[in-house]
UniProtKB/Swiss-Prot annotation:
Annotated signal peptide: none
Binding of heme b b562, residues: H83, H182
Domain of life the protein comes from: Eukaryota
Quaternary state and interactors: The cytochrome bc1 complex contains 11 subunits: 3 respiratory subunits (MT-CYB, CYC1 and UQCRFS1), 2 core proteins (UQCRC1 and UQCRC2) and 6 low-molecular weight proteins (UQCRH/QCR6, UQCRB/QCR7, UQCRQ/QCR8, UQCR10/QCR9, UQCR11/QCR10 and a cleavage product of UQCRFS1). This cytochrome bc1 complex then forms a dimer.
Gene Ontology CC: one annotated term: mitochondrial inner membrane
One of the Pfam families matching this protein, by short name: Cytochrom_B_C
Lineage per the UniProt record: Eukaryota, Metazoa, Chordata, Craniata, Vertebrata
Cofactor note: Binds 2 heme b groups non-covalently.
Species this chain originates from: Helarctos malayanus
Function, as annotated: Component of the ubiquinol-cytochrome c reductase complex (complex III or cytochrome b-c1 complex) that is part of the mitochondrial respiratory chain. The b-c1 complex mediates electron transfer from ubiquinol to cytochrome c. Contributes to the generation of a proton gradient across the mitochondrial membrane that is then used for ATP synthesis.
Location relative to the cell: Mitochondrion inner membrane
Family under the similarity heading: Belongs to the cytochrome b family.
The protein's name: Cytochrome b
Gene3D superfamilies tied to this protein: Cytochrome Bc1 Complex, Chain C (1.20.810.10)
Gene: MT-CYB
Amino acid sequence: MTNIRKTHPLAKIINNSLIDLPAPSNISAWWNFGSLLGVCLILQIMTGLFLAMHYTSDTTTAFSSITHICRDVHYGWIIRYMHANGASMFFICLFMHVGRGLYYGSYLFSETWNIGIILLFTVMATAFMGYVLPWGQMSFWGATVITNLLSAIPYIGTDLVEWVWGGFSVDKATLTRFFAFHFILPFIILALTAVHLLFLHETGSNNPSGIPSDSDKIPFHPYYTIKDILGALLLTLALTTLVLFSPDLLGDPDNYIPANPLSTPPHIKPEWYFLFAYAILRSIPNKLGGVLALVFSILILAIIPLLHTSKQRGMMFRPLSQCLFWLLVADLLTLTWIGGQPVEHPFTIIGQLASILYFMIFLVFMPIAGIIENNLSKW
């Protein structure tokens, strides 16, 4: 009798994706973040579902419904903070996952990479709309500032903003639709993830050496299932430590003040994981220019496969490119810091220089480094 795992139509799909999947024998811990993102997504959907049972998307009651969840719902506080800090964990894993793709040349799987970019945009949109829902000061003003950026689009900008708002300002209609989108988007992310994996399994995984590993494959289970479970345990440990000891560490104190359209907070800023993009947006004095820079700061990932000049796939044996990669990491950390600072000297000029460096690394330095390394290796 043949194994049901290999014959049943549904079990067969799971088997070919998670059990008998041939995987390279040398993939490192940097390959753990894909599965960790899956864990984060499931956690966010589960906690979000329970929060949605008690949340009301009305401007008069949204803030007090969050208070009600934290005070009156059984373990509501832990569900709320797991959801809020789970988003931070999600983005940490996302940045690591994208960084891994850049370092080891995984972007050459263009279909997988492009679906990944769409996923990144979708997750960012979901997180932004989720931040608006508690209807605190930073929620309201963050929504106002970011949605207002659409008005920079020539000719249709103003109409577009009012269409998104559902009125002439951020109000009840905006909150209601943001809640609706915030609820549906994770399921769209889930579907896109399935497509992401579908394309990945067409080519198989990349590995640290960047050399095809067809001659040296091992089954995904038990080797990588154990490895992924260890990663998930460490992620859970980090998240529960954050939730139980300092749940508000990554949040903004202003969001504990109910939204007030008549009082602007001194420093409007998004959650920490958007600060790098926010710093790039602010570094350009022109509104449309800033919006374009903001969009291209993420969209630039789509043209990276076209700018790959090296004869080697990954950066494992390319010291010049390695230096540039870590310069990029340092630059992103600098931008994150600048995004949280007020718009004044010297932060403005640091932000502008860091923004220029960010685009220069991708568009100029990386391709040149690839050409230099090709010549150095005398191929």
